[in-house]
Design a protein with these regions (language model features):
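Long, low-complexity segments enriched in small/aliphatic residues
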Residues: 144-220
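Non-catalytic alpha/beta scaffold blocks inside enzyme catalytic domains
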Residues: 1-162, 166-171, 175-179
């Protein structure tokens, strides 16, 4: 609340206070269980405002039980991934190797997101929608970082600032024009390792092959 009052989050709070949320999409979290007072405060204050709650999970979590739609996620051994164990005491990423294909209708999160991207593009075309605005771009904080001084952005300009995108481009943006395949995360994991090396998170001699053989990787 203090940060909001002081304006430190100006331009980053989306949606604004005047916009009532309509859809809550939850992936990799269980807010009704993990947040303090979740089953009381959230169910009483937030849930009645929502038209749809969608949860992605491999089990019937507390949040899933209160969701309108539950998308069954693949379990740990049904997809290839890194398990991030992050704390001041544990500085390792564990490598999770796929042992079997997803059971039943379950899918990996990556597969789900690709499917949603294609569906959004298709439904937008069916409804005659072409463009949408991404709320990034000129903000007081960015102006101060680049110019050394903050600029006051008139309220009338705020809706048109940001990046203009097209709905039909969403699938290609997600896969970087087909570089990443929905059915194979090999290239994405390799690039993840390389970007971590570039940022100094992993040591320079690391590679996906070495991490696979070792089963884990230490990060800085």
């Amino acid at each position: 609340d203090e940060a909001l009052r002081a304006g430190w989050w100006e331009g980053f709070v989306r949606p604004g206070p005047s916009v009532e949320p309509k859809v809550l999409f939850i992936m990799g979290n269980n807010p009704l269980r993990r947040l303090r007072g979740g089953t009381r405060t959230l169910l009483e204050e937030l849930w009645p405002k929502l038209g749809k709650v969608i949860t992605v999970d491999f089990r019937w979590s507390t949040t899933a039980l209160y969701s309108d739609i539950v998308l069954p996620a693949a379990f740990f051994y049904e997809k290839e991934q890194f398990h991030t164990l992050t704390s001041s005491e544990v500085r390792f990423w564990a490598y999770g190797q796929k042992a079997i294909d997803p059971v039943g209708d379950s899918r990996s999160e990556w597969s789900m997101v690709n499917g949603l991207a294609r569906t959004i593009a298709r439904r937008a075309s069916e409804r005659g929608l072409d463009e949408y605005q991404v709320p990034h771009g000129v903000t007081p904080e960015r102006c101060k970082a680049v110019l050394g001084r903050a600029l006051t952005i008139p309220d009338a300009l705020r809706p048109i600032l940001g990046t203009l995108r097209h709905f039909h481009e969403i699938p290609d943006l997600l896969t970087m024009n087909g570089k990443y395949s929905e059915d194979d995360v090999e290239q994405a994991l390799k690039d993840m390792v390389e970007r971590c090396k570039d940022a100094g998170i992993f040591e320079g001699e690391e590679s996906l092959e070495k991490i696979r053989a070792r089963g884990f990787v230490k990060y800085n």
